[in-house]
Amino acid sequence: MNRSTRFTMLALAAAATIATVPAPLRAQRDRERTRIDSTFAFDKGSWVDVSVASGEIVITGWTRPEAKVYASIERGWIDAQLSPHRITLQTRSDRGRSGDTRIEIMVPIGTRVQASSASGGIRITGTAGEVEAGSASGAIEVIDATDRITVRTVSGKLHAAKLRGRTRLGTTSGTLEAEDIVGDVTAGTVSGRITLTGVKSSHVSAETVSASVTYVGSIDPSGSYEFSTHSGNVHLEIPESSAADLFLETFSGRISSAFPITLQPGDISAMARHGKKMEFTIGKGGARITASTFSGNIIIDRGGHTDREEN
């Protein structure tokens, strides 16, 4: 091998090394960005997974077969993986410091969404797919979701609507409001009011420690419904045609019902005591409704009638 040939081969080898080594580095730089503005084909039913340390997340469903992603971060990086089958965005701090992040994503209806923020609000609307959303400090709104729906916030208001599927909602110190729900519902707070309206479900559980619980919805004759609070009122507004067995208990409050109550002799003596415990049937019975509070009132209204005193 002459000198010229050997030099050529070494040059080619060096070029190959230069070409191959930076490739993953370039890919890494492509993933780690401070700003993203991209539109690309995206399959219906695919996943979106977004996680930020501080900032707002907005995800919206639309009818186009594509995704539009806009993201920016003041300090730090956005680790992004964008494909026709999955969108993954995760923020990383710069030397332990991370600025506010803003993420806006448009996806086809039917996309499944996971979103989390340590400090910031989350809004997911019109995706009509599975949703899992959580925030340590921030309000969350979810409108139009199906299948499995899980939404939790530690310190912030939670609002959800147009839910179709198995729904789990929870807050620690924020109010919880949900309406237009079809499917099983579990809702819980520590110090936030719970309001569930327009519910069509055979299984509902709503529990809080120091706030009121309100339920406006249907009663399935074969269903079960549980409502409890320690220091708030329980207000149920159910159809006049409901068929249910009610089990109501309050220690220092009162029980009020718009439905006729027939008490047995033993029940009359129980009502005379300081604590009040009542069991009665409306319609032909069937569904099991349990409501309890320690220092609040229990109010049972017919659907469409909300003029009974709650204080």
Put a short name on every predicted segment.
Residues M1-N311:
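Intrinsically disordered, low-complexity terminal regions
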